[in-house]
Design a protein with these regions (language model features):
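Glycan-processing catalytic domains of CAZymes
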Residues: 1-245
């Protein structure tokens, strides 16, 4: 962990665009809860403490560690806090069914839209640490791993995502939480896409812009795609959706 933290300090933390909270670089560890499962509580805690020490020696006030997981569990959140994590995040929110362990599939995106705000309020009221609300862009992992034992979110729309952004702004105003995650942006093989694409155009980015940005007096810049300037988007031949197994 010291080697990893040293690399972070030398190559990432000192860049202007790197996210910092109270001056501390943010490190979001995917499936952070597995540190304890794989190495034990004492070793997991020592990993994070070693990274904190490296960051302080490099001139930073420390690291703001975030543990990412698939859903929220208050008891597990308390365990993560005891290891040294200060915040939680969810890779993608897939509706209240996921919270209760009801992994029904397929699942309509409308269900995700309708329950996001209530979920954020639930986590905010029960978590022993802060969290990053996840603004879900959908989920369909069939191109990567097929359909067996996976949740598939259907009928994803930029209009629905705009409603999620509106609720996120409402939640931020209610709680004072200033940090939100849009996620994912570019998981093309998992159907979680916020970047411009043929299905939604610029719709999802426009929703974020309109809800959280400050419109210039001259209006928003014109959206330009590669084809607008005579460029073709590269395409890989032979890609096709895996059949349902």
């Amino acid at each position: 962990m010291r080697a990893a933290a040293t690399y972070w300090c030398e190559h990432y933390f000192n860049t202007d665009e790197y996210l910092k909270i109270d001056g501390r670089p943010v490190v979001d560890i995917y499936t952070g809860y597995e540190l304890k499962a794989k190495f034990g509580e004492a070793e997991a805690r020592s990993f994070l403490e070693a990274a904190q020490d490296c960051a302080r020696k490099a001139g930073f006030p420390g690291i703001h560690f975030v543990a990412q997981r698939a859903n929220f569990d208050p008891a597990l959140a308390a365990e993560l806090a005891s290891l040294g994590f200060e915040r939680l995040s969810v890779y993608k929110y897939l509706s209240d069914a996921a919270r209760d362990g009801r992994w029904t599939s397929p699942r309509d995106f409308g269900q995700v839209v309708a329950t996001s705000l209530a979920h954020w309020r639930y986590v905010h009221g029960t978590s022993p640490v802060k969290f990053f609300p996840s603004l879900s862009t959908g989920y369909d992992p069939r191109p990567w791993i097929g359909a067996v034992n996976n949740v598939i979110v259907t009928n994803v729309t930029s209009r629905g995502f705009r409603r999620i952004c509106e609720d996120a702004r409402r939640f931020s105003d209610e709680t004072g939480e200033r940090y939100l995650l849009m996620g994912p942006l570019d998981e093309w093989g998992e159907g979680s896409i916020g970047y411009p694409n043929r299905q939604h155009g610029f719709g999802m980015l426009e929703a974020v812009r309109d809800m959280f940005g400050e419109k210039p007096a001259a209006g928003w810049p014109v959206n330009i795609a590669p084809e607008d300037v005579g460029l073709k988007c590269p395409r890989r031949k032979g890609l096709q959706l895996r059949p349902t197994r």
